[in-house]
């Protein structure tokens, strides 16, 4: 047996006297872990001194070198193990810390990268805006000191903001500092202040014929036009300081904390007879304003000085310009801003005196026709200019009588059609009031500018900025032949289609299945209506959505009860769905229209008659029109939206007639000067009535869409709308937009006010040289739909 260090001492002790051997041997067996040590020398010791070992056990414990060494080794091993555990835990925590630090750094880098991208995009946008402005107006758009954005660290930005004194002016000083920092980030320097003061002088100095104004004129053109020739003076007059600041609109949507503080500083707004009184420190124009307030043009020009007045107007805050209706910020305790702007008051006073004299001499100056300007810009599709509050548009529309000059016939009206806001929150682009409610502009909605040319240039930008683009969302595929007609449920996202495959189908747009190879969704029909024995050509849904009417080549009108939108497609047959059949026509029924006011139905047929029905009565056919075919064969029919006691019918001869439903007499024949010629070119495919105005719109085989006044019967406007025959029309429930479908495979959306195309959608493929048969707006939801000869119906959102 191997002996440890303690056992080595037992060997020589055997030859020694027994008394000496006993102590170490006995003690070693009692020491901690010493049993193994006594193993080598224990037995000889107990043999020689066994009887004397008993009393030694009660003695105090004594430590030996072998026992101590063994204990130290044991403790050292335990310490090493705990230390290894601690090292592992520390490594794990350090790895966690490093991961979190890396994540934080990555987020910071991402933030910096996004900030850089934003700045670069702002820079690129300004470059594009300048390029576009030069192409359109032929002048350089002054954007201050346009240069590449510089990216400085957050620390330096923080040190730039000085600690403002804690006084009453702390709020607006912080706002000014914030704006100054914004200006530096986007490349504007203090020269913007000089440009703005020069702009004021340009309002007065460019029209100045005296020599002392010529120097200012040249300097201004050097600043604004980059050395352009004086030929652009007229255009420079039209552009005001708002143009210089138009690139600052990216600040309008910023969620600044200063906004609430600034709102607290706004005082009461003067109204009514006080509109011409200016309640704050002017720069030298107190007396002059009082002298000239009787002239509105003078008042307009003098209001251009308002952005020089208080520090709250900020260096470059376009939305803080004083509004033309007297909405101004009154803070008399603010310090004068002469040192801020560095304006030569003497020169300003002198120029104003000259302006006052000139105004007395030119009272009858002809102003630019605002509507012509608006129409021209609308035709150009001005997308790039910044948007302006809708209040400006309302003000501009009401401020002048708008003569439109699309055609000579249209100029007979002093006030052309203005398209108001209807109910239903205008899911389409909507009128200005609806836009304001949707966008929630709040106080910003009251801000206006007072220069005619300024918002004439920006007007179409507002329309385009709020423009909604329709995109295909659902494809309805279950028909086996061309889809001739479709109609939406008045409330639910439900659609009914009528097809040449002899059936009608009910679709719930909320029950969709993913399409195989496209981003759109396929919808399965939830019900199929079967009663016609030929192609179904026309369709109408009652105003409460409970009944549906369909007409076909079998000369019948089928009357249906609408199933529930949640009906099971595989449920048992329900005979109550078919409510009845209206029989009176002798040929195909090509058009249907329903009026919810008296629950009446109109139908037009290839037999030459137009019939009025009340399906609830025992003798449902109330009246028959055009029984002698005096106007030709009717092709389409509709109730007059603003006068339900009248209806309008189009004929294949090109004539359109308004009838009185009570007397059955024709009231007005709608005709245009060009309605003489071939019958095929005059053929009208569809007639619709505007929902709120006395206007009738017709779609023609010769690619035209024509607008008629119901009162005079004269054509208001005519336009070539498509590349092929126009087959279908629909007006949105608010009466702002018109949708047309054509055999050229396209759907076009038109602004009824400007008669311009807002959007074109290629929706269907041709089949036998025919494409789109019908289009429809949902009465209350953001859906439009089209029906095509390719057996598809498509829904857009």
Curated annotation (Swiss-Prot):
Residues 44-55 have a biased composition (Low complexity). Residues 1-60, 313-336 are annotated as: Disordered. The modification Phosphoserine is found at residues 202, 214, 229, 257, 335. Belongs to the WD repeat striatin family. SUPFAM superfamilies: WD40 repeat-like. It comes from Bos taurus (Bovine). Residues 1-12, 33-43 have a biased composition (Gly residues). The modification Phosphothreonine is found at residue 150. GO terms for cellular component: cytoplasm; dendrite; FAR/SIN/STRIPAK complex; Golgi apparatus; nucleoplasm; plasma membrane; postsynapse. This is Striatin-3. GO terms for biological process: negative regulation of DNA-templated transcription; negative regulation of hippo signaling; negative regulation of intracellular estrogen receptor signaling pathway; negative regulation of transcription by RNA polymerase II; positive regulation of transcription by RNA polymerase II. CDD domains: WD40. Pfam families: Striatin, WD40. WD repeats lie at residues 478-517, 531-570, 584-623, 679-718, 721-760, 767-796. InterPro entries: G-protein_beta_WD-40_rep, Striatin_N, WD40/YVTN_repeat-like_dom_sf, WD40_repeat_CS, WD40_repeat_dom_sf, WD40_rpt, WD_repeat_striatin.
């Amino acid at each position: 047996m191997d002996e440890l260090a303690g056992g080595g001492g037992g060997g020589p002790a055997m030859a020694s006297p027994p008394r000496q051997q006993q102590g170490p041997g006995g003690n070693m067996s009692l020491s901690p872990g010493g049993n193994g040590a006594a193993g080598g020398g224990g037995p000889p010791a107990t043999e020689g001194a066994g009887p004397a070992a008993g009393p030694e056990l009660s003695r105090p414990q004594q430590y030996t070198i072998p026992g101590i060494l063994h204990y130290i080794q044991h403790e050292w091993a335990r310490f090493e193990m705990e230390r290894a555990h601690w090292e592992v835990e520390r490594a794990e925590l350090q790895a966690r810390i490093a991961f979190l630090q890396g994540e934080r750094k990555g987020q910071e880098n991402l933030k910096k990268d996004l900030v850089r991208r934003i700045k670069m995009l702002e820079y690129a946008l300004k470059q594009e805006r300048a390029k576009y402005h030069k192409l359109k107006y032929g002048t350089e758009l002054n954007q201050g000191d346009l240069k590449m954005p510089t990216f400085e660290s957050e620390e330096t930005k923080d040190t730039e903001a000085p600690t403002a004194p804690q006084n009453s002016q702390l709020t607006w000083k912080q706002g000014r500092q914030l704006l100054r920092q914004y200006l530096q980030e986007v490349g504007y320097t203090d020269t913007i202040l000089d440009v703005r003061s020069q702009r004021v002088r340009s309002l007065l100095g460019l029209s100045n014929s005296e020599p002392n104004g010529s120097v200012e004129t040249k300097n201004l053109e050097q600043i604004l036009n980059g050395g352009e020739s004086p030929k652009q003076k007229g255009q420079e007059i039209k552009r005001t300081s708002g143009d210089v600041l138009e690139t600052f609109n990216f600040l309008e949507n910023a969620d600044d904390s200063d906004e609430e503080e600034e709102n607290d500083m706004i005082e009461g707004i003067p109204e009514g007879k006080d509109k011409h009184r200016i309640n704050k420190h002017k720069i030298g124009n107190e007396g002059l304003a009082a002298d000239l307030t009787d002239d509105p043009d003078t008042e307009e020009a003098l209001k251009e000085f308002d952005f020089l007045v208080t520090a709250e107007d900020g260096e470059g805050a376009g939305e803080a310009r004083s509004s033309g209706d007297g909405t101004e910020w009154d803070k008399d305790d603010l310090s004068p801003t002469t040192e801020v702007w560095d304006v030569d008051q003497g020169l300003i006073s002198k120029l104003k005196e000259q302006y006052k004299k000139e105004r007395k001499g030119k009272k009858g100056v002809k102003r630019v026709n605002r509507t012509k300007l608006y129409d021209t810009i609308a035709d150009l599709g001005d997308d790039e200019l910044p948007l302006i509050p809708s209040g400006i548009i309302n003000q501009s529309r009401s401020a002048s009588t708008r003569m439109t000059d699309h055609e000579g016939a249209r100029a007979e009206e002093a006030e052309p059609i203005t398209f108001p806001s209807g109910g239903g929150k205008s899911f389409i682009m909507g009128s200005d009031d609806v836009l304001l409610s949707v966008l929630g502009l709040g106080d910003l909605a009251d801000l206006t500018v007072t220069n005619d040319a300024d918002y004439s240039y920006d007007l179409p930008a507002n329309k385009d900025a709020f423009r909604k683009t329709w995109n295909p969302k659902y494809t309805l595929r279950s028909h086996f032949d061309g889809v001739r007609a479709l109609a939406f449920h008045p409330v639910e996202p439900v659609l009914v289609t009528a097809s040449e495959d002899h059936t009608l189908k009910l679709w719930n747009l909320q029950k969709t299945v993913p399409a195989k190879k496209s981003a759109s969704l396929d919808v399965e029909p939830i019900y199929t209506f079967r009663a016609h024995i030929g192609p179904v050509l026309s369709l109408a849904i009652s105003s409460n959505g409970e009944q549906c009417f369909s007409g076909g080549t079998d000369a019948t009108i089928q009357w249906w009860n609408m199933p529930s939108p949640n009906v099971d497609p595989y449920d048992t047959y329900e005979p109550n769905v078919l409510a009845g059949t209206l029989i009176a026509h002798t040929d195909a029924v090509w058009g249907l229209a329903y009026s919810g006011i008296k629950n009446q139905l109109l139908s037009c047929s290839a037999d030459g008659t137009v019939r009025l029905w009340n399906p609830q009565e025992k003798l449902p056919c109330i009246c028959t029109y055009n029984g002698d075919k005096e106007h030709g064969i009717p092709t389409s029919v509709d109730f007059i939206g603003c006068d339900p006691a009248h209806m309008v019918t189009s004929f294949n001869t090109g004539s359109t007639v308004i009838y009185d439903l009570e007397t059955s007499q024709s009231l007005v024949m709608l005709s245009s000067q060009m309605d003489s010629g071939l019958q095929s070119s005059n053929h009208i495919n569809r007639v619709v009535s505007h929902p709120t105005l006395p206007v009738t719109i017709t779609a023609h085989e010769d690619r035209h869409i024509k607008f008629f006044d119901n009162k005079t019967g004269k054509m208001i406007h005519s336009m070539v709308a498509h590349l092929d025959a126009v087959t279908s029309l629909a007006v949105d429930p608010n009466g702002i937009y018109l949708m047309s479908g054509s055999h050229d495979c396209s759907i076009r959306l038109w602004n009824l006010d400007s008669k311009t195309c807002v959007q074109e959608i290629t929706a269907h493929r041709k089949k036998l040289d025919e494409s789109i048969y019908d289009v429809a707006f949902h009465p209350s939801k953001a859906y439009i739909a089209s029906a095509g000869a390719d057996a598809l119906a498509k829904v857009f959102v």
